[in-house]
Amino acid sequence: TGFRFSLGGAQKKLGVTPDIACFGKAIANGYPLSVIAGKKEYMEQFEDVFFSFTYGGELPSIAASLKTIEVIEREGVINDILVKGERFIQGFNSAAHSLEVDYMRAFGDGSWPKYEIDERFGFTTNEILTLFQQELVRRGMLTRTTPFICYTHSHSDIENLIHACKESMAIVDKALTEKNLHNYIDGEVIQTIIR
């Protein structure tokens, strides 16, 4: 749940107090660590059972997590990501609007922006997404429909992503207008693997 939305995770942002919450990935900035946190009545159950875990007692990860949390607080990391994400959403939608591409839109919270593509002219979302992704890669951008923006991305990186999206949208729109999408695609069409 956390640190994309707030230091206390999504539950803090949404005003929910969960019985149990899990933190992983970002908590130690790449070091192997995950955390289970929860209400005292549930966490006390660990006193009565034997439990073990792969990285139990691995102190460098614990030190990394403490430093990570310190940096997130001190440098305003969460707000920085939020601002960059909001800029991506605004820029993506502005690009789509300027090209009259009404079948692509960005949405969501700035801390976790997403974009979606509607079916058009008998082509599926995955077919259109394939060409869009291909053109983004040609412009040095590798992302799926959720461009996970992080603290190390600069404002220039976000502008470059928006520019690449706009150029890719123009190519997709040309292919769709010509009803010739598959002639623009170099590889296989993206397949949905998780349903």
Predicted regions span which residues?
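Conserved N-terminal phosphate-binding loop of PLP-dependent enzymes in the Aspartate aminotransferase
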Residues: T1-R195
